[in-house]
Amino acid sequence: MKKNLIYSLLFVPFIANAQQDLAKYVKPIIGTEKMGHTYPGATVPFGAVQLSPETDTISYEQDGKYNGDVYKYCAGYKYEDHTIVGFSHTHLSGTGHSDLGDFLVMPTQGKLQMNPGTATDPKSGFRSAFSHQNEVAEAGYYRVKLDDDNILAEMTATRRVGMHQYTFPKSDQSHIILDLMSGIYNYPDKNVWTYVRVVNDSLITGYRQTNGWARTRTVYFAMSFSKSFKSYGQKNYDRKETYRGFWGKFDQTRNFPEIAGKQLRMYFDFNTAEQEKVKVKFALSPVSQENALENMNAEIPGWDFDQVRQQARAEWNKELNKIAVNTDEDDKVNFYTAMYHAFINPTTYNDVNGEYKGLDQNVHVAKGFTNYSTFSLWDTYRALHPFFNIIQPTRNNDMVKSMMAHYDQSALKMLPVWSHYANDNWCMSGYHSVSVLTDAIIKGVYTGDPEAALQACITTSNHRDYEGIGYYIDKGFIPSEKSGTSVSNTLEYAYDDWCIAQLAKKLNKQSVYEEYMKRSGNWENNFDNSIGFMRAKKADCTFQKNFDVMSTNNQGFIEGNSWNYSFFVPQNPALLIDRMGGKKKFASKLDTL
């Protein structure tokens, strides 16, 4: 397979015009079981909308403490579950922490219920039982039968708009619920504020502000129905507030066109004929309700669901056809599903007019590039962005420009560490943007100013208050008393510094090159020659006692242990091999890993 893959990569330009339906090999359901943390719903390559079902809504806290079960729902969907609460428009894929789950929509019929019910008793609320036998997940398309209300739910998407199609039974009590309370990694105070405006009997707009992994996040929306609703209403679950003003003069619970609060659910009522399809277009914007509506009108001007679905599949086929593999069918499923997952993030983060909200919370315009967000760089700098330099060079160029825009807007003057939705959540370790920038510049992908990029790398790497960098600069390592991840931080900073050195060398900055090459050797300060492993070191330069190479707790490593992190010296493998006793001992050690 490797031989065929390399051959195909070399001949991508020659196969581009003979597109195959490679999307047929994509199985988005892969990764949704146990701890895969992927979602099965509809999205397009690098899309801002990820329209997917939530199989439960688990609170981040329980009895005032962290609820471990919430981790199972990083992507909102768990294959083992048997109920669906609704379909929301934003999701993270493959992460070990989470956020999002904005604007949950659920069709129902019969008696109106405004609470979601429970997994053990779905009929006590608006959620529904479902079966995987009646579920289809494809690239750009999702379908499921909602058993309790006999409704067929279908989803597709464009870059900034999700499209729903609900096939109802005959009923004079059909409803579509919009839950503005629901969210992934949710907790009672996560919603800072929500606002909804009913523009007419088929269009509503609004926004939601949340304080989660991204601490200041606002998402605007426009929601359009293919059929006029006959009535609507809302329920406000806010705790009693000290001041509510004089809005009590109105009955805001039914047919009132302007609603605001922290904990809101809305409903829209319809009469439906047997097998009648009611469609919903749901557009997002980081900037304004007006922009969300503009995104909707630009990307899905009509109501042809099948056309949008076919367009989404065509977009996936365009990307998947960049690599051809000659292997058996099962391997093709694994390969193209993995390729599909690789092309979900980073996500588009600007409107069709180029506007986006920057890290400074001001509105900016992406001039000459697409602005991207969702940079999980600790996870992606090693392989994903180098991969993009080969088969997504234009996009990776835009991604680097997005990182530079992030730096320019940063109050701390730092490149992104883990950014999404105009926030940096500072998750994981290292300053791995510098690796992505350096690789793109040296390979000729980045079309921006390399001198400015180098300065951004230097400034980021010298932010002394961030995660032990001051100690790292002064002592050549981070004392274990100062950080619970002191060793992994030191190792990752050392690699990043080597990247900065290579960029400085390309730009003929000799003094910078020498400084950062010296810093790139700091890994040696955590290498214990007596045992051949990386080991936490105290401020007095003695190695930490009670050392366990297998343990992942209190040993100075993040999501790892000394056994796997001791091999992380990609900038100087020859010296690492020497320190571990030569090639034979090194190979033997690898074999026992």
What feature does the model see in each segment?
Residues M1-Q20:
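Bacterial Sec-dependent N-terminal signal peptides
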Residues Q19-H385, N389-S435, I441-L491, C499-N525, ...:
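Accessory carbohydrate-recognition regions in carbohydrate-active enzymes
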